[in-house]
Amino acid sequence: MQRYELIRLIGKGGMGEVYLAHDKACSRRVALKRIREDLSGNALLRQRFLREAKIAADLIHPGIVPVYSICSDGEAVYYTMPYIEGFSLKSLLKSVWQKEVLSKELEEKTSVKSFLPIFDKICATVEYIHSKGVLHRDLKPDNILLGLFGEVVIIDWGAAIFKHAKELKLEQDDEAAVSFDERNICYSSMTIPGKIVGTPDYMAPESLLGVEASEKTDIYALGLILYQMLTLAFPYRRKKGRKLSYRDVVLPPIEMSPYREIPPSLSQIAMKAIAINPADRFSSIQELRQALQPYLQGDPEWTVKATLMAKEKSCWKYYDPILLSRYFPVLASSPAQWYNFMLSEVEISASTRVEYTVTKSAVHEGMGILFLPSKEAERGEFYCGYGLWFSVQNHELTVSLIKNGIEIQKKSQEMISQQSRFAILIEKSDNRIAVFVEQALFILHIDYLPSLGNRLGVIIQDLQGMSNIAISESIGALRVSCLAVPDAFLSEKLYDQAAIFYRKIRDSFPGRKESYEAQFRLGVTLLTQIEEQGGDLTQALSSFDYLHGGAGAPLEYLGKALVYQRNGSFVEEIRCLLFALKRYSQHPEIPRLEDHLCFRLYDSLHKHRSEALVFMLLILWIAPEKISVREEERFLRIIYHKQQATLFCQVDKAPLQFRSSKMELFLSFWTGFSLFLPELFRRAGGLRDYQALADIFYVAGVSGNREAFMQFSTALANVSDEITFPESLHNQKVAELMFFVKGVEALRNKDYQKAKKLLWKTPFTLQLYALDMFHIQAFLDEEIESFIDLLQAIYDPASEEERDHILVYIIQTHLWNRDLERAYKLLNDRFPLDEELAEYSEAFILWGCYLALTGDRVVVKAHFSRCRYKYGKSALIGKCVDGDIFDYLDNLVWWEKKMTLFQSYFLLRCLNESPRRYEKYRQAYLSMENNFFD
C-alpha cells in the first residue's frame, strides 16, 4: 500500500473498511476499501472480499462506482475506486427521524416527489445488475450513496454474487423447500459475516429461513427502501434481536404516515414489493419500475367519484330511446335501430376515468360512450365532443373514436372466441384520450386542445349486458398543470376569464413550455370566442404571432392553420401546416401537427372530399405510420373511381399500393399538389424506374405545370449518358424519354411534323401520354386536324389492346366533327347504353355529348340525372345544360375541376350553344391554376 496515503476512515461494513486516501502516483483522492484486520485471516471472507471487487469491476453503470485497481498480494487485500463526495441515504433518512418540524430545505429533500426519482435510479442500477446475472443481496439505505451533484450509486458489493454460482450453494444451510406462513423471524440491522449473507433487517423472510437468494430477495429490500422513503419510518418497531410475527406488524405506508399524503396505489406498490410470499411480489425490477412510471411522470391518482347503474334512472339526467343516426351518423350500423340513451346527472372533471365491463352480445349491434360539453348537452346537441363506438362482429372487436360526429380513428382486433365479457377502461385527461380493453391499450388520441366534454353519455341496446359504470377522478398527481384553471374556464366557455389566466401563465414562465402552451391556448380561446360571438376570424392571427421564433414556434403555424380552416381559406391553411412541418421537422411539438393532419383528413372525408386527398397526401409523405392497414383499405375504396379514371393507372395494370411513390404521384395529380414532384422524380431516377419517370413527366405536363416539366427535362438531360435502364423495364433508354420530352415541347410549339418524328421513336405508353396531353389543347384551340393526324399516326401501328386506350379520343373527334354515325357505332359497340356504365367513366360523358348532338335536351338531362353523386363531376357536367355550374366546383378535387370545365365546354359545343356560353368554360379552364398554390 505504499502508493496510497490513508487520510481518514469514512465507512465501515461487515467485512471491510473504507478510507479516503491519496493516490501518490496519480496525485488524486480515491476511496480505498480493505478487508478488516480481524477478518483478514478468514480464507472464505478473503475470497468473498476479492469477489466483491471483481464483480464491481465487471459492472459498468452510472449507478455503480468503478474500480480503479485491485490488490491481493501478501497480507494486503484492498481495492480502490473514485471518491464521491456525498452522504448515504440512511443519513438523510436519519436526519428527519423523530423530528416534528422540518426545515423547508429538509422537507423538500425528503418529500415523496424528491425521493421517487432517487428510488428509480436505484432500481435502474439493480435492473442492470440483474441483467448481468448478479444479485446484490445487501441493498439498504446505508449502501446507497447520494452524491453532491445528483449521483445515486450503490456501494458495498461484499454480498453480491452471480446467480447459480457454486458459492451460493455453499452459503445455504438447507436446500429444502420452506413454507412462509407465520414464521417467527429474527431481525438485525448489521451485516453478519459468515453463513447468513446480508443485513437481516433488509433480508426477505425466505432468505432468513435459508432459501436461495433470487431477484425477488433484492426486490424485497428495494420495497423496504421505498417504504422508508414514503413514510420516513421503518416498518418494524422492536428491539434488536427480538422475534416478531411479520404479518401482524407491517402497516401500509398510507396508514403508517397519513400526514405524508401518499397516493394509495403508491402505498400498494411498496406493500407488494415486501409481500411475505415471493410469488406475491413484483416478478422483476422492470415491472416494479413500470408501476412507478405514472408517479414519476406526474400522472394522476384516481378515486371513485360516482357509480352509475345502467338501469337506475335516478343516475341519469336524460334517459330515453333514440335513433342511432342522430349521434353516430357515420357508422355502418343501421340508423333505423333504436337504442337506449342515457346522459349522466353527475358532471365529470377534466381528468376522468370510466370503467365498466360489457358482454360480447351487448355490443353485437354496437354501444357508444360520449363525452359531451354541458351546454350543448343541455340543448340536446349530443353530437358535439368526443365519442367512442364499440362493436363486435365475427369475434372481432372494433373501436371507433368520434369527434363532433366525425370518425377520426378506428381500430379492430380479434378476440378470444370463448371470451363472453371484457373490461373497458377509458381515460380522458387534458388533451388525451386513451382506451384500454382488458388492460391493453387499444386507442390513444392526443388533441391540440383539452377535451371539453364534462357529461357522460351512454348508447346501448342491451342494458342487461353492461355492468355498473365507475367514474373516477384524479386526486393524487405529483404535479398538476398550471393550465388546469384556465382550461376549466374554457370548458365552460368563460372566454374572458380563461384569457386572463392564460396571459398570466404566459408571462410567469418565460421561455418554458407552460408559457408557449398558454399563449397557444389563448389564441384558440380568442378564435373560438370570435367564431361564436361573430366577427372577423383573422383578428385571432395576431395572438399566434407571439409564438414566432420561440420555443413553441410550430404552434404559431398550427394556430394560424386553425384560423384559416375556420375562415374557409384552405390553401392558406395548407401553407401554414407545410411551413411548420418542413421548418421544424425535428421539433418535439411536431407530433401535435401530425395528429391535427389526421383529424383534418377524417373531418374532410365527411365534409369536403376535395380537401381529403390533400391531407391524405400530406400524411403519406410526413407521417405514414398514422394510417393503419385497415384504414388503407378504406382509403383505397374511396379513391377507386379516380384510380379507374387515371391514365397512368390504366396503363400499369399492377394494383395501386397505398404506401408507395405511385400513390403519392396519384394524389399529387388529382390535387394539383406539385410540391413533392421533385422528390418523387429524384427517387425514381435513383431507382432507375423508367415507368415512374414517365408517369411524373405525364403528371407535370397534363396538369399544365410547365416549370416542373422543364426542370425535370433539364435534370434528365444531365444524366442521359449515365443511366441505362435494366432489362426488366423493357430495356428502354433515357434517350426514348428525351424524345418524348422534346416531342411534347414540339406539340406545345405547334411544330406537329417534328413532334410526330420524335414520338415515333418512343414506346406506345409515351405516345399515349403525349396524345392525352395534346388532345385538350387541340380542342380548346380548335386545331382538330393536327390532333387527328397525330392520332392516326399512333393508332395505325398499335396493337388491338393498345388501340383500346385510343378509342375515346377517336370518338371525341367524331363528335366534334358531327360524324354521328361513326360516333354511335363505336359507342354502341364498345360501351352500350343498355349496360351499366360507371358515371365516372369517360364513355358516360361521351354518350351525353352524343345525345346532345341529336338535339334532344330532355334526353341529355335524363342521361345525366342517372348520376348517384349529385355534385360529382358527371352530374355537374349535366347541370351545365340549363345553367352555370361554377358555384358547385368547390366540391371537386383540383383535377376534377379542370376536367369538368373542359368537358362542359365540349358538351356545350355539341349542343350548339352560343359562343358566349361555352367560351366562359373555355376561359375558366385556361385561367385555372396550373397547380395547387398558384
Swiss-Prot record:
Q: Which Gene3D superfamilies match?
A: Phosphorylase Kinase, domain 1, Tetratricopeptide repeat domain, Transferase(Phosphotransferase) domain 1
Q: Which residues form the Protein kinase domain?
A: 4-296
Which SMART domains does its entry note?
Answer: S_TKc (SM00220)
Write out the catalytic residues in the record.
D138 (proton acceptor)
The post-translation modification note in this UniProt entry reads: Autophosphorylated on serine and threonine residues.
The UniProt record gives the binding positions of ATP as: I10, G11, K12, G13, G14, M15, G16, E17, V18, K33
- What enzyme class is recorded for this protein? transferase
Keyword Kinase in record = yes
GO MF entries:
ATP binding; protein serine kinase activity; protein serine/threonine kinase activity
* EC code: 2.7.11.1
**InterPro entries cross-referenced by the UniProt entry:** Kinase-like_dom_sf, Prot_kinase_dom, Protein_kinase_ATP_BS, Ser/Thr_kinase_AS, Ser/Thr_kinase_PknD, TPR-like_helical_dom_sf
> What Pfam families does the entry give?
Pkinase
* The reaction(s) this protein catalyses: L-seryl-[protein] + ATP = O-phospho-L-seryl-[protein] + ADP + H(+); L-threonyl-[protein] + ATP = O-phospho-L-threonyl-[protein] + ADP + H(+)
SUPFAM superfamilies of this UniProt entry? Protein kinase-like (PK-like)
- UniProt keyword list: ATP-binding, Kinase, Nucleotide-binding, Phosphoprotein, Serine/threonine-protein kinase, Transferase
Which CDD domains does the record cross-reference, listed alphabetically?
A: STKc_PknB_like (cd14014)
Its assembly, as annotated, is: Interacts with Pkn1.
Checking PANTHER family in the record gives: MITOGEN-ACTIVATED PROTEIN KINASE KINASE KINASE 20-RELATED (PTHR43289), SERINE_THREONINE-PROTEIN KINASE YBDM-RELATED (PTHR43289:SF34)
Report the NCBIfam families cross-referenced here: PRK13184.1
Q: What is this protein called?
A: Serine/threonine-protein kinase PknD
The species is Chlamydia trachomatis serovar D (strain ATCC VR-885 / DSM 19411 / UW-3/Cx)
List the taxonomic lineage.
Bacteria, Pseudomonadati, Chlamydiota, Chlamydiia, Chlamydiales
Originating gene:
pknD
